[in-house]
Curated annotation (Swiss-Prot):
This is Transmembrane protein 182. Residues 34-122, 177-205 are extracellular. Residues 144-155, 227-235 are cytoplasmic. Pfam families: Claudin_2. Glycans are attached at residues 48, 90, 107. It is found in: Cell membrane. Belongs to the TMEM182 family. It is a multi-pass membrane protein. Residues 1-33 form the signal peptide. One of its GO terms (cellular component) is plasma membrane. The keyword Transmembrane applies. The keyword Signal applies. Keywords: Cell membrane, Glycoprotein, Membrane, Myogenesis, Signal, Transmembrane, Transmembrane helix.
Length: 235
């Protein structure tokens, strides 16, 4: 009875972890950015002034951007909801042009360093998703049997995927805080527009990832415990 409960909750947490991984992997909202350029003439002033801003959102596959008119004190996160986005937007492959890097600067050292860092980030995320999915298939195959090795292998894969995705989250934090060189990008743009500002924040794809990590790690520990229990009782 206790073994069945462990298998049930392990399967439940594992399924939730895989689902969250797939959503975070497939959605392009790991990074949100807003560029405001107040250098044009006849610019409105005041707390409720409306400005034309450029919004970016980026994930594993794509980096997209679109123009949006908003008030100075508006909530940036709300502007990225599908219902609030522009009818058309421009997109490019994120691994070739991660924000704020641009392929026009392909000869610069910072661009190549960003691509290398981004490449490792992509690899860790892809490995995390694949490892969790394979672990899920192993557990499904182990369900009709009492083979402790399959349960332990599945549990180990879930824990490995949790560690890989934890590295993805940590690397993304470092990317936003230092590697992407937001300050250098802002300084460069301010040479042409002294009132240029850029705001960068973590998107909901990033915020989902820790929940997937928790579920996969917990599922992995449960399946390791199930495998150990089966092994003890079959001796």
């Amino acid at each position: 009875m206790k073994l069945s409960i462990g298998i049930f909750f392990g399967g439940l947490f594992g399924a939730l972890g895989i689902l969250i991984y797939l959503v975070a992997f497939g959605s392009d909202y790991w990074l949100l950015a807003k560029e405001i350029e107040k250098c044009s003439e006849n610019q409105e002033t005041g707390d409720n002034a409306t400005h034309s801003v450029l919004l970016h959102h980026e994930g594993f596959f794509w980096r997209c951007w679109f123009n949006h008119a908003e008030e100075e004190n508006s909530n940036t996160m709300e502007n990225f909801w599908f219902t609030n986005q522009a009818p058309t937007k421009n997109c490019t492959h994120a691994y070739l042009s991660p924000f704020p890097q641009n392929r026009d600067n392909s000869n610069s050292t910072s661009y190549h360093s960003a691509l290398v860092y981004r490449g490792f980030w992509n690899i860790f995320m892809l490995l995390g998703v694949v490892t969790a999915v394979i672990g899920g298939f192993l557990i499904i195959c182990a369900a009709p049997f009492t083979n402790h090795r399959i349960y332990k292998a599945g549990g180990g894969l879930f824990i490995t995927s949790g560690i890989l995705f934890a590295l993805v989250v940590v690397m993304h934090v470092f990317w936003v805080q230092s590697v992407s060189d937001i300050k250098g990008y802002t300084d460069t743009r301010q040479q042409d527009c002294s009132q240029f500002t850029v705001y960068v924040s973590f998107g909901w794809s990033f915020m989902l990832a820790p929940f997937g990590i928790f579920f996969c790690l917990f599922a992995g520990m449960l399946f390791l415990l199930v495998g150990h229990t089966i092994h003890v009782h079959t001796k």
